[in-house]
Amino acid sequence: MDSVKRWISGFNENAVLASGFEDAFIGICYRYNNYPVAAYDKERCIEVLIDDFRYMQDMHEEEFDQELYGKAVEYFNSTILKNYTKDNAPVFLTLYDK
């Protein structure tokens, strides 16, 4: 996280990083009339949440169920996105798969 913070501060020293989602960081996003902000892969963020939920429930990595995925998506949409609404907040991208 420190290396990402140092790197992004070269573009925007006030950029906010999404805590706990270091593995989902993909770069920066430019917006007109705004400073660049941190960009994260939304699907990877959901995978991080699933891993966290598995750990809390003592599940094996191979175990996947649709309910757990649904809980992670719901938590992301209802909690994570709401935490990052101010200036310099990160953006979460859905990547195009060719």
Task: Specify the residue positions occupied by each region the protein language model found.
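C-terminal alpha-helical interaction appendages
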Residues: 1-98
